[in-house]
Amino acid sequence: MIIYLHGFDSSSPGNHEKVMQLKFIDEDVRFVNYSTLHPRHDMQFLLNEVHKLVSESKDPAPLICGVGLGGYWSERIGFLCGIKQAIFNPNLFPYENMTGKIDRPEEYKDIETKCVENFREKNKGKCLVFLSKEDGILDSQRSAALLSPFYEIVWDDVETHKFKKISHHLQRIKAFKQR
């Protein structure tokens, strides 16, 4: 089973495209929709939904996958639920760049301070990170500097922030999920 979390633009047709691409490596792909506007509520909702999906699944190695803001949540929720994560251009600093787009971006900072201490150290090797060399929205070098001590980073020369086409990374995701 692969659980897919969308980014800030939940209505983008690219979400459906990514779900369809993921079905090439696992026919059981679940799309979890969340508000994106209320971080504390989103965290509780996502934690409950993902925990329920993982509990009901017969897959011995489920994976959570997300793009942008969905990558932010996938890393954290995947860690808390004990499943591997594949994240594309994760928005690691939403409290800096979501001002004016959501009601309380400062809640992300609060979530960060209340999260398990050194969670990335405890999650080491359980997350596969895909970063665009030309993201266009986020600073990929900053993300790589933060994440590379803990996770494998895969650089993409073609895609931009929304990572419209993930098909050329599917076999790597499949191998990561299975190991």
Swiss-Prot record:
Matching Pfam families: UPF0227 (PF05728)
Coiled-coil ranges per UniProt: none
InterPro entries recorded: AB_hydrolase_fold, UPF0227, UPF0227/Esterase_YqiA
Residues spanning the membrane: none
Domain of life (superkingdom): Bacteria
Record-stated family: Belongs to the UPF0227 family.
Name assigned to this protein: UPF0227 protein PM0825
Organism encoding this protein: Pasteurella multocida (strain Pm70)
